[in-house]
Each structure stands twice: as structure tokens, then as C-alpha cells.
Amino acid sequence: MKTALAASGQTESEAIRMKEKSQVADIDRSVYDIRDKEDDAYRMQEGLTPETIDKLSKEKDDPVWMQQFRLQSLQIYNEMPVPDWGPSIEGLDMDHIATYVRPKTDMKNDWKDIPQDIKDTFERLGIPQAERKSLAGVGAQYDSELVYHNVRDEVAAQGVVYTDMESALKGEYADMVHKYFMKLVTPRDHKFAALHGAVWSGGSFVYVPKGVQVSIPLQSYFRLNAKGAGQFEHTLIIVDEGASLHFIEGCSAPKYNVANLHAGCVELYVKKNAKLRYSTIENWSKNMYNLNTKRALVEEGGVIEWVSGSFGSHVGCLYPVSYTHLRAHET
């Protein structure tokens, strides 16, 4: 030890101080570990079968093409092996994961209309406060569905679309969703991409028109409260030519003694000379399997910035990739 210190020119006390500075303090998870009483409106039976996927499609009133997409994704999921190139996930048994849990409220655009216990959860996490101070819009998902979504009037007046995926899928932007949904991340990419294609629910849809600069961030927060459940939100963002956006994603869940699963999907389209910063802060409990897939397609002159802080989880696998002119750039 003394020889090594001498070679580096450090005294022993200096080495100790450097070691102390390099250690990251444990995160206080107390705010994240507070559980709400499980009081769901509907919980899908555990397991994955064509019958459960049909029930999910009916529950969500999917268009026909999405019903078919889900069933095709399930078939691919059943055909594909568990990936052997990452950490072991042998403790994850999909026969004991509820793939859809609907909260006891539909989506609101005013916090005062949300049930008090759910609102208290997001208050503890600081989401309404952040919206008031520094965000252009906020989406808040609780288990499998959005319970809150809102965007500032001045941002909407610029033509910026920020809504939940279900509204985009079945409303004015249905054609755009059909064009872009799971084209960057396809069900055949890997087993958990196929799982996502079969059971996805929730998430946010963003479209920024040509030349529009969104000066303050949008944020979506995904909270998984249900025990033994999965969360499979889909985020789809298109930033058109010459436009710019900063999008923030936050995730957390309380700790249970059984496995929970987060297998979200992010698809980002950055058009010519556009710019997108995508920031993620995840704070997972130690029973969480966090298996995310994120991709961006960046056209000529476009810029994508990935900023990610992913903490906790029993197993975590995050693989953001940017494609530019048919070349992949791992980030």
C-alpha cells in the first residue's frame, strides 16, 4: 500500500479523502417506498395467453390493427428465447405478473379531480410542484394508465401535441401513431420487445411541429404501485424539422417481496436539423426487473442527447441506441 502511495505521490490521508469523495451516498428511498393501499378498478389475471390479450384489447377498446398487432407480438414472444446476453432474469416468472392494472380513476387535467391517495403519491414525489415551477406539461401514470395529463396553453398554441398514447391512437393522430409505432423497436428485436408489443399500456405521445422551439421541458412520470405487476408504457416522440424539445421521464415503485417488472419502450424521431434531449431519472426498488428498450432515429443535421440516471432495481438493462444515416451509435 505504502509503495503504491509513494508511486502516486499521495499521502495516506489524501488517499482516504479521495476514496470518501468517490463513494456515492446511499439514496434515501423513503419517499419512493411508501405504498398506497391496493384499490384498483381492474386487475388482469396473471399469465400470457391469447385470451388475456383479447381481454386487454377489449378493455382498452383498441382499433382492429392494434388488436392484431398485440396477438402477433404475443406469438413472437412465445417463439423467442429468453436473452442469454444480459444479466440473469431467472427470478422473473411471467405466469405471476399481472400485465395490466387499471387505477380507480380515468385521466384528468386538473390535480384536484384525482383521488386523494393517488394525488398524495405524486405530491410526495414533487410532480405537481415541478409542473407549477418549471415544466411546459406533465403526464402522470399510475400502474397501467395515465391519471393526469396537461400542457400549458402557450405551448399548445404553438401546435405542440402532448397527450397520452391511447388518445393519440384512437383520435386525431391515429395515422401518425400507425406510421411510427414500434417501427424503431420491433417485436422481433428481443423477447421483451415482443412482450411490450403484446401488453403495452399508457405512455405519452409528443409531436413538435416544424421550427417550433419548446423552451421549457415536458415531463412524464410513471409510478408502479401494484404488487406483482408489470408496467409497459410506450413513449413516442416526433420532433419535426428545425424544432427542439427537452423531454424528462421519471419512474419509481415501492418495495415488495415479489417480483415487479418494468418493460417500457421509447421511440424518438428527430427530423432534419431538429434537436431532442431525452432525460431519464429512475429510482427502482430492489424487487424490480427493469428491462427498457429505447431507440432514436436522427435525420441529417439532427441532434439527440440521452441523459440517464437509473438507480436501484434487482436487474436493470437499459440500451439506448441512436440511428443516423443507417449507422447505429450506442449511447
What is the meaning of each model-derived region?
Residues 35, 50-54, 299:
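Short acidic (Asp/Glu) and glycine-rich catalytic loops that position anionic groups and cofactors
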Residues 148-150, 154-327:
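Conserved beta-strand/loop scaffold segments within soluble protein domains that form the structured core
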Residues 1-13:
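Intrinsically disordered, compositionally biased charged tails
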Residues 30-44:
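Conserved oxyanion/phosphate-binding beta-strand-loop segments in alpha/beta enzyme cores
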Residues 10-12, 18, 26, 325-328:
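Intrinsically disordered, low-complexity regulatory regions of eukaryotic regulatory proteins
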Residues 16-19, 23, 27, 42-189, ...:
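N-terminal amphipathic, basic helical "cap/leader" segment at the start of enzyme domains
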